[in-house]
Amino acid sequence: MKQRILVAVVGVPALLGVLCFAPDWATMALIMALCIIGSHELLAAVLPPEKTRRWWGLAAALSVFVVADVYFRGEPFAGTPIQGLMPWLTAAQAVVVFICMVLEYGKKEEMDFTALCAILMAGVAIPMALTCLLRLRMLEHGAGLVLIPLVAAFMSDTMALFGGMLFGKTKLAPLVSPKKTREGAVSGLVGGMAGMILFRIFFFLCTEIQLHIGWCVLLG
């Protein structure tokens, strides 16, 4: 609980400051930093420590190139040399991963199939998911639209926590997560939908643009 409160007091305002008020390149830098940290966390979870130290830098570098590629594909960079160059640089970095796999074959810290999958997951799949925030930020009224996944996630998580604490009696999946309850799950679902309805109202007051209420509820 203390950790959640600390994140809410310190982390959330800092996150909102970067996403909503800083230039869109700051969002790119934030996502790059998250991908670098996430690369290490993922590899550390599935690989031995020696292989994690050996390969996480490669995964982190690939993730940075993927994020940069998405950023420079934006309309402000249309027709610029960097927009044409980034896909080739990203592809070259991906090729480097497979070259390393071949060169290190048979050695103690070789890149086996598990390591390759972890590197590609950390270097490609996760960055592609996180760059959805970047794509939202680069749209018109992106400073507001980028909050959609955050509002849905935070409201759902918060209501699931407090709903479970107040009303939770029936275990949801005790073998997977002993503290989760069905009442908490329902509270989270309701909280996410309610949060998105409130977001729709505030977004209209700020931009005079009406988001489709059905989509807002579905996203919640």
Regions of interest found by a model, annotated:
Residues 1-217:
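Membrane-embedded alpha-helical bundles of polytopic integral membrane proteins
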